[in-house]
């Protein structure tokens, strides 16, 4: 059954049961003091409201029959998957650079099995959800995401999480090039960097690559009364 989500720059109509909520990298690394972003000098002090909003969005999406996909960014504990000096990721990843500057952190940041890699305590995948590891910013790169979505007839993706200007935007952009409709819930996302990069990322998304809405509006669009209005 179709519903219409009020969004910028215009409303978008979608079928929740042929859509997915994407929770990108809600790991201790990105949202918890003592995690990678915090240790690398980024401000994570305002992530708690974002976590609460993601909980709300996940609950509403699950009740409406949307697929929930959780991403965890990181690599094996030897960082082979991160790429060596021949990879730009080796040179640009702030996690890898932080560990080179602080050798005592080696093996602790974004390593599979570590506390840093784990999802935050408040967000727990449920049976029927899909949890995917990813080795780079985009959730489409070297993962089965595209085939998972296509095999289920899913064309609409609703994005939450951290960081808006890095992994969220990278995944949404790649989805745009693969003919997916991407929506970001702005109050369920958080940037890596100053506030202006959040605004810049959202501007890019709503102007060039997708749509921007918020959690309250999203939940309202998934309510039974909204389906009744469309019907």
From Swiss-Prot:
This protein is called what? Ureidoacrylate amidohydrolase RutB
Q: Which organism is it from?
A: Escherichia coli O157:H7 (strain EC4115 / EHEC)
Induction of the gene: Up-regulated by the nitrogen regulatory protein C (NtrC also called GlnG) and repressed by RutR.
Q: Which family does it belong to?
A: Belongs to the isochorismatase family. RutB subfamily.
What Pfam families does UniProt report for this protein, alphabetically? Isochorismatase
> Active site at which residues?
25 (proton acceptor), 134, 167 (nucleophile)
Which keywords annotate this record? Hydrolase
InterPro entries the UniProt entry points to:
Isochorismatase-like_dom, Isochorismatase-like_hydrls, Isochorismatase-like_sf, RutB
Going by the entry's taxonomy, the superkingdom of the source organism is recorded as Bacteria
Matches recorded under NCBIfam families: RutB
Q: What is the lineage of its organism?
A: Bacteria, Pseudomonadati, Pseudomonadota, Gammaproteobacteria, Enterobacterales
Q: Which reaction does it catalyse?
A: (Z)-3-ureidoacrylate + H2O + H(+) = (Z)-3-aminoacrylate + NH4(+) + CO2; (Z)-3-ureidoacrylate + H2O = (Z)-3-aminoacrylate + carbamate + H(+); (Z)-2-methylureidoacrylate + H2O + H(+) = (Z)-2-methylaminoacrylate + NH4(+) + CO2
Question: What EC designation does it have?
Answer: 3.5.1.110
**Purpose of the protein:** Hydrolyzes ureidoacrylate to form aminoacrylate and carbamate. The carbamate hydrolyzes spontaneously, thereby releasing one of the nitrogen atoms of the pyrimidine ring as ammonia and one of its carbon atoms as CO2.
GO molecular function per UniProt: hydrolase activity, acting on carbon-nitrogen (but not peptide) bonds, in linear amides
Q: Would the keyword Hydrolase turn up in this protein's UniProt record?
A: yes
Hydrolase listed as a keyword: yes
One GO biological process term is: nitrogen utilization
Q: By which gene is this protein encoded? A: rutB
